[in-house]
């Protein structure tokens, strides 16, 4: 155990009582718990994502519902369900929990995380969501094979058919449509692509709305990049653009803050100032999109602190019952809404340490 962890444990009671005092006994939400997570050697990338997901209510509710079922052999989802259940059923309202079982399982299942080096929070989020979806799909498949699926359809799909959607997909999955218009015959072709999170490029002194608009900018395909048009049966100049066709329940936006620099032969951090609003409406939607006017509220932000992808630290800010909290491993603090501006990034292009929003979680209104 490190000196930092020992010091943290000594301060647990102080931090916890301070948090309860800051929130106030009358304002403290009923049946809510705010627990920090112990760092097991550069596991802040994991802790920060887990805290963000815990405060994405639809995700938390489904994980806890999974825990309530009679279960099976241990896997990453059972360990996550145990952790969420442990937080949700604590007698105390605030405190610290060691996610030891989850971390051990994670390291056992994926060599990428089986070390004490700093990892990328976005890579972990992607791995976690896909792994949970795979587990749920495999369980559904096994239930069908065992004849345990109640009210089963007699016309079941073939074995090689597309896997069933899970609650992970229902919460996070959106659809992009790639539209290409031939400039000779005006024929428009489109190809759909599903996503669980959306990665967008960042520029200096911009906003999330600007980043999303750039994501869907029209690109002209000409010269050597000409498009083969099936209607013209030849290569033609064309215009290509990406639009959002299906909006997810929770929109996870990944800001591409790490860029490979040829002259340095390594990735460096783009600490650009990117404003992320508390409310968001997407305008880069396709003409046939469902719920065009869907409004989103910011519920969590995973923040990267430092100057590079393999060094630094991750923290999370979340919105819970109308107020904001900062989770820094085992430390939990109440913060003002105005303090969120500190995590937009830096206005200077000079590479230095910064606390910058890295993964944003926006939840749609009912």
Curated annotation (Swiss-Prot):
Keywords: Behavior, Cytoplasm, Hydrolase, Metal-binding, Protease, Thiol protease, Ubl conjugation pathway, Zinc. Gene3D superfamilies: Cysteine proteinases (3.90.70.10). It is found in: Cytoplasm. It comes from the Eukaryota. Detected in lung and spleen, and at lower levels in brain, kidney, testis and liver. Its EC number is 3.4.19.12. The keyword Hydrolase applies. The active site is at residues 44, 313. GO terms for molecular function: cysteine-type deubiquitinase activity; deubiquitinase activity; metal ion binding. Its main location: cytoplasm. GO terms for biological process: adult feeding behavior; behavioral fear response; behavioral response to ethanol; protein deubiquitination; proteolysis; regulation of postsynaptic neurotransmitter receptor internalization; regulation of protein stability; regulation of synaptic transmission, GABAergic. Residues 35-365 form the USP domain. One of its GO terms (cellular component) is synapse. Pfam families: UCH (PF00443). It catalyses: Thiol-dependent hydrolysis of ester, thioester, amide, peptide and isopeptide bonds formed by the C-terminal Gly of ubiquitin (a 76-residue protein attached to proteins as an intracellular targeting signal). Interacts with WDR48. Interacts with WDR20. Interacts with DMWD. Component of the USP46/WDR20/WDR48 deubiquitinating complex. Belongs to the peptidase C19 family. USP12/USP46 subfamily. This is Ubiquitin carboxyl-terminal hydrolase 46.
């Amino acid at each position: 155990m490190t000196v930092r962890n020992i010091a943290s444990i000594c301060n647990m009671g102080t931090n916890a009582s301070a948090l309860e005092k800051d929130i106030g006994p009358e304002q403290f939400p009923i049946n809510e718990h705010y627990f920090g997570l112990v760092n097991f050697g550069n596991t802040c990338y994991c802790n920060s994502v887990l805290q963000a997901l815990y405060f994405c209510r639809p995700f938390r509710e489904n994980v806890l519902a999974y825990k309530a079922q009679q279960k099976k052999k241990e896997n990453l989802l059972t360990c996550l369900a145990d952790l969420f259940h442990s937080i949700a059923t604590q007698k105390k309202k605030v405190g610290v929990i060691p996610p030891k079982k989850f971390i051990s399982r994670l390291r056992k299942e994926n060599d990428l995380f089986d070390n004490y080096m700093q990892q990328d929070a976005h890579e972990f989020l992607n791995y976690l969501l896909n792994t949970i979806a795979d587990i749920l799909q495999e369980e559904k498949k096994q239930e069908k094979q065992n004849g345990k699926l109640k009210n089963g359809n007699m016309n079941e799909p073939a074995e090689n058919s597309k896997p069933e959607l899970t609650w992970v997909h229902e919460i996070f999955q959106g659809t992009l449509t790639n539209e290409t218009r031939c400039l000779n015959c005006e024929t428009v072709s489109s190809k759909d692509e599903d996503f669980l999170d959306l990665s967008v490029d960042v520029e200096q002194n911009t906003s999330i709305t600007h980043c999303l608009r750039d994501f869907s900018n029209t690109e002209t395909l000409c010269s050597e990049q000409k498009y083969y048009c099936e209607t013209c049966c030849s290569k033609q100049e064309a215009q290509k653009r990406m639009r959002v066709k299906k909006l997810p329940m929770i929109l996870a936006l990944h800001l591409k803050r790490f860029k490979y620099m040829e002259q340095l032969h390594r990735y460096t951090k783009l600490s650009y100032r990117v404003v992320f609003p508390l409310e968001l409406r997407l305008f880069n939607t396709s003409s046939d999109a469902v719920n065009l006017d869907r409004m989103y509220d910011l519920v969590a932000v995973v923040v990267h602190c430092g100057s590079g992808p393999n060094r630094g630290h991750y923290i999370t800010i979340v919105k819970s019952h109308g107020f904001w909290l900062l989770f820094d491993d085992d430390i939990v603090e109440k913060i003002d809404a105005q303090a969120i501006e500190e995590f937009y990034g830096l206005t200077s292009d000079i590479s230095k340490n910064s606390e910058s929003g890295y993964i944003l979680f926006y939840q749609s209104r009912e």
